[in-house]
């Protein structure tokens, strides 16, 4: 993300939060990025973030920008069900994820209603074993090509 901002002439400062680091004051933060990882790492990160659940929720509800990919997205939901264990999520988004049969891997193209045509397409790559189901919020985009949150469900994010 830093490199893409630099390419566009946008200055940025990255503050990495590592395990056991306290969460900084979010009032001056422009964007939070939560990435992914393996199931064991997700469990550890979720336990750490649980301490800051209210701060993250308030940041988002105060129009803060948060990008969550892979397991980071799943952790924002109600729960993530593994084969033999259920990880309680942060309950910030009304979603839940369950382990599926096999991985969904390949290119994905989304149409995002919140972007203006002709620049409303998002192209990416998906590689996930979880199947995420959305409750009461609007998906990030409609799948034009690929799988999305679950097996050919028609939406992603």
Label for each model-derived stretch:
Residues 18-20, 94-96, 126-128:
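Residues at the C-termini of beta-strands that transition into short coil/loop
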Residues 15-17, 33, 67, 91, ...:
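Hydrophobic/aromatic beta-strand patches that form the interior of the parallel beta-sheet core
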Residues 98-157:
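Amide-donor transfer/coupling interface in amidating biosynthetic enzymes
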Residues 1-61:
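N-terminal beta1-alpha1 cap of cysteine-dependent amidohydrolase-like domains
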Residues 39-114:
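Cysteine-nucleophile active-site neighborhood
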Residues 33-35, 73-77, 125-132:
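Long, contiguous hydrophobic alpha-helical segments, chiefly transmembrane helices and signal peptides
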Residues 32-34, 64-68, 120:
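Short glycine- and Lys/Arg-enriched binding-loop motifs that mark or flank ligand-binding interfaces
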Residues 8-11, 22, 81-85, 113-121, ...:
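Short, glycine- and charge-enriched coil/turn segments that flank and shape catalytic ligand pockets
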């Amino acid at each position: 993300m830093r490199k893409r901002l630099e390419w566009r002439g946008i200055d940025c400062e990255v503050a990495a939060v590592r395990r056991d680091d306290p969460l900084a004051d979010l009032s001056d933060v422009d964007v939070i990025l939560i990435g992914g990882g393996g199931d064991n790492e997700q469990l550890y990160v979720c336990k750490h973030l649980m301490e800051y659940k209210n701060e993250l929720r308030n940041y988002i509800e105060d129009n803060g920008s948060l990008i969550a990919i892979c397991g980071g997205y799943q952790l924002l939901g109600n729960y993530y069900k593994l084969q033999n264990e259920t990880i309680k999520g942060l309950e910030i988004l009304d979603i839940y994820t369950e382990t599926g049969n096999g991985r969904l891997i390949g290119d994905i193209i989304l149409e995002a209603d919140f972007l203006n045509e002709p620049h409303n397409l998002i192209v990416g790559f998906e590689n996930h074993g979880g199947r995420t189901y959305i409750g009461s919020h609007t998906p990030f985009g409609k799948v034009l090509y690929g799988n999305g949150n679950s097996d050919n469900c028609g939406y992603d994010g």
